[in-house]
Amino acid sequence: MSWQAYVDDHLMCDIEGHEGHRLTAAAIVGHDGSVWAQSATFPQFKPEEMNGIMTDFNEPGHLAPTGLHLGGTKYMVIQGEAGAVIRGKKGSGGITIKKTGQALVFGIYEEPVTPGQCNMVVERLGDYLIEQGL
């Protein structure tokens, strides 16, 4: 399966039991910042934004004082899982980032999608990729 198919079929799909509700943007990005696949709506990000995200995975709490920036949008960092998941909030939406062995799985959402639904979609694919050694 292509990386684009993972984004299209597993991240940008309807959320179980909520037809028509889906993430607003998603991507799979290598630890080096190279985009493996992304939705058409995923923001253009700067290398320093990706560096900050990777630093937070290695040094949990790094982004808490400044916020998480992606594509020029600032998210307030909320409770995640140290070294595994970063979660951010902005207004009625937010972001979930799951780290796998080789990649970062991104999901961005707006209401009516809930933070929990975004977490479920992103983390389920991330856990699958980890099981596959990716």
UniProtKB/Swiss-Prot annotation:
Disulfide bonds join 13-118. SMART domains: PROF (SM00392). Phosphorylated by MAP kinases. InterPro entries: PFN, PFN_euk, PFN_sf, Profilin_CS. It holds the Pfam family Profilin. PANTHER family: PROFILIN (PTHR11604), PROFILIN-5 (PTHR11604:SF25). Binds to actin and affects the structure of the cytoskeleton. At high concentrations, profilin prevents the polymerization of actin, whereas it enhances it at low concentrations. Occurs in many kinds of cells as a complex with monomeric actin in a 1:1 ratio. This is Profilin-2. It comes from Olea europaea (Common olive). The lineage of its organism: Eukaryota, Viridiplantae, Streptophyta, Embryophyta, Tracheophyta.
